[in-house]
Regions:
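Conserved ABC ATPase signature
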Residues: 137-141, 145
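Short coil-to-helix segment of the ABC ATPase nucleotide-binding domain corresponding to the Q-loop/switch region
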Residues: 94-103
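Conserved ABC ATPase "signature" region
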Residues: 65-66, 113-132
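Catalytic Walker B motif of ABC-type/P-loop ATPase nucleotide-binding domains
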Residues: 162-165
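Helix-to-loop junction immediately C-terminal to a conserved catalytic motif
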Residues: 50
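Conserved catalytic motifs of ABC-family nucleotide-binding domains
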Residues: 158
């Protein structure tokens, strides 16, 4: 049984059909990366799994249990199993670094502040940040350090499933490589299932076990990361090599 099973996922906004029947599985302990250009439905797919958006049709099962339509305490219990690294880090500038890391523990799980701080320091250490940054405000940190803090927050409650939204956006190549290494380290160390969305092929190659390509609201290819450069799929070939000419370009021009 897959950890995550998505079938026939559809979502439209007014006349704009974003998801047109998305299907994929993610095995337990696997790192799936969903690639695709801007506006192809990557973020909408993640938001549907998280319950931030309600799909118009389709099924999303976690460990064989349907999650579409969950609300109240049932939704809250499901969310406790998730961790999320947002594209812009999404840290609270009014809180100290350790309070950002511990926010979900204190507010969502009722963990006492002293214990939550200990956990926060432990998770900061796991992403290469020392105790000296704990009392600082996020604005006092570099973009790369903020991303590390956000990763520490994502793993603070030791979730079963981690979601990464464009984890290396805005980072220089060296810091992006650091974040990619930390993602792999955290995913493997915790034994969690991971779903990432990105258009960064360097990041994809480093963190993915399997890759799915989303185009015009459908998965057009799904396979092992090792096969990405010889997929035999014209959409994938054009995207990963950054070629202007190809089926993606032709369909955009015809739209």
């Amino acid at each position: 049984m897959p950890k995550i099973a998505v079938r026939g996922l559809q979502k439209s906004f007014a006349v704009n059909r974003v998801l047109a029947g998305v299907d994929f599985d993610v095995a337990a302990g696997e790192s799936l990366v969903i690639i695709g250009g801007s506006g192809t439905g990557k973020s909408v797919t993640i938001k549907c799994i998280l319950g931030l958006l309600v799909p118009d049709a389709g099924s999303i099962e976690i460990d064989g249990v349907e999650t579409v339509g969950l609300a109240g305490r049932a939704r809250a219990r499901l969310m406790h199993r998730f961790g999320m690294l947002f594209q812009g880090s999404a840290l609270f500038d009014s809180l100290a670094v350790w309070e950002n890391v511990a926010f979900g523990l204190i507010q969502g799980r009722g963990v006492p502040r002293r214990r939550a701080r200990d956990i926060a320091l432990e998770k900061l250490a796991a992403v290469g940040l020392g105790a000296e940054v704990a009392a600082l405000r996020p604005a006092q940190l570099s973009g790369g350090m903020q991303k590390r803090v956000a990763l520490a927050r994502a793993i603070a409650a030791e979730p079963e499933i981690l979601f990464f939204d464009e984890p290396t956006t805005g980072l220089d190549p060296i810091m992006a490589d650091v974040i990619n290494r930390l993602i792999v380290q955290c995913v493997r160390g915790l034994g969690v299932t991971a779903v990432s969305i990105t258009h960064d092929m360097v990041s994809t190659r480093k963190i993915a076990d399997r890759v799915a390509m989303l185009h015009r609201g459908r998965i057009v290819w799904h396979g092992p990361a090792a096969d990405i450069d010889h997929s035999g799929n014209p959409f994938v070939d054009q995207f990963v090599n950054g070629r202007e000419a190809g089926p993606i370009h032709m369909q955009i021009r015809a739209a």
